[in-house]
Amino acid sequence: MTYLQQHARSIAEPAAFWAEQARSLAWYQAPANILESLPDGTHRWFADGRLNSAYLALDRQIEEGRGEQTALIYDSPVTGTQDRYSYLRLRDEVARLAGALRALGVGKGDRVIIYMPMVPQAAMAMLACARLGAVHSVVFGGFAPYELALRIDDATPKLVLTASCGLEFDRVIEYKPLVDKALELAIHQPAHVMVWQRPQAPARLHPGRDLDWQDCLAAAEPADPLPVASGDPLYIMYTSGTTGKPKGIVRDNGGHAVAVRYAVRTIYGMQAGDVWWGISDVGWVVGHSLIVYGPLMCGCTTVFYEGKPVRTPDAGAYWRVIEEHRVNSLFCAPTAIRAIRKEDPHGERVKRYDLGSLRHLFLAGEKLDSSTQHWLEEHTGRPVHDHWWQTETGWPVTAPCIGIAGHDLRAGSTNRAVPGYHVQVLDDEGRPLGANRQGAIVIALPLPPGCAQTLWGDHPRYLQAYLGNYPGYYHTGDGGYLDEDGFVYIMGRTDDVINVSGHRLSTGEMEERVAQHQAVAECAVIGVRDELKGHVPLGLVVLKDDAGIAAEQLQRELVALVREQIGALACFQRVVVVKRLPKTRSGKILRAVLRKIADGEDYAAPSTIDDPTILGEIEAALRVRKAG
């Protein structure tokens, strides 16, 4: 079938369409109940099916003759090391680690927090949990102890898996003290912390609680994969939302397996034996879907990269990896390409490497600007594809489907909806909008397999946040429009979540931290455009009358406060002191207007504004800040 035929069938007959895709999986018990509608508007896929995600990623590939094929390539320019894991070797190491977890009492349904850098042991930890039917929650190593503590308290893990340190191009980041601090802050206390010791900064272990990873492996017996129900959770991934505790996105086993296999083959055009490079961190959804589970379930070789686009050692790092490992296709965020372009504007380093193996480049995670796309296409000579998805969906919503005949592209768009997704645009009253009219991007229910259907321990919050605004639709939180041919154009977030270098961060959470400062009377944090990172946060602060603090000192203290409580990845570096903030007559801060002023866009004072003269004051304050 062509793309248009597949998409039409997936919308008209979702159960039949996804039943066909599910037949390509090796289930322990194939599902007969494909799609079930629940009274609250959510849906359940493959409810009576039984499978194991680690089995599909490893054992099944060995059974199909790929045991000696390379499953994972570890490339670490920050340590100067490389390693290759065949499917057999990776399966054996995962099975032994699963046995070690089992010996510590980890079983089906137990949660395990994984707080690790980009080392193969992070992927092994995920797969070992899946092998036992345990639920992993990977927390990005850049998060501060306070954020890690929130996730520990929400997931209540039996075990924390960590490494002694992570490595940047210019420094060593000791992880163990961060974990120790998080456990001091957390109410819930896991039974043990298992530590992968790295020679760059060995960690001190607390007797009775902390365990050496290698010692645990040495005493373990390998564990076989445990069949679990399709709807049993595979992992929890925490994502930034509005103020309050982070949202724990729950991914099921069966729907996820069907979806990521379909995505890797259909969207990215990858086949068994191909070399795929998903450039991200295992702490993000891309790391789950496109570094670990998706490529391995399709029999591909996945590249596991511990480095940066630049300074490890230079702007040719990506092209070296492509040449050395014969990468066929890759995924990265536009921020990475902008960083490379900034250091190598004429593409001189690209020319030094043989990119003959490379077929496609896929970019997502933030808006892809046309100049970055054109630069990349010009210097690599390969097609560059924009596409769009979310942590909540787990796999792309709109994308070119390279693996299907009849796909086409349109510059400036994130391409058409992938089969399974019925994307529409609605106005504020929930009415469908015609072509080229901007509104709220929504997805008509049912969501396809792989999409989150609940939040960990807070189903009412899921219903309110995602299904409550537009009955019968999933609300993406993004605004945009469709053209007359169904191509989707994403214009940005409609809530308080901003995209910093491909990381979704809540300005509301940053506001909470800024407001803690004793000199701050009121504040607003907004996302402003940044040439390199896509967006960065900007703090607008009203001081208390008796604050008695210089603006420069205040900025230093607020930057340190946000860095300590959220992490350096927030990129919170700019603070502007203002006399007052613009509000509606009901007291709501006009953040959308503030964003337009900060970005130099035209704006109109809304009819609900309390005092329009404040807008001129804000403009003047931002001009002074830029001039300074």
UniProtKB/Swiss-Prot annotation:
InterPro entries documented for this protein: ACAS_N, AMP-bd_C, AMP-bd_C_sf, AMP-binding_CS, AMP-dep_synth/lig_dom, ANL_N_sf
One GO molecular-function entry: propionate-CoA ligase activity
Cross-referenced CDD domains: PrpE
Family from the record: Belongs to the ATP-dependent AMP-binding enzyme family.
Listed name of the protein: Uncharacterized protein PA3568
Organism: Pseudomonas aeruginosa (strain ATCC 15692 / DSM 22644 / CIP 104116 / JCM 14847 / LMG 12228 / 1C / PRS 101 / PAO1)
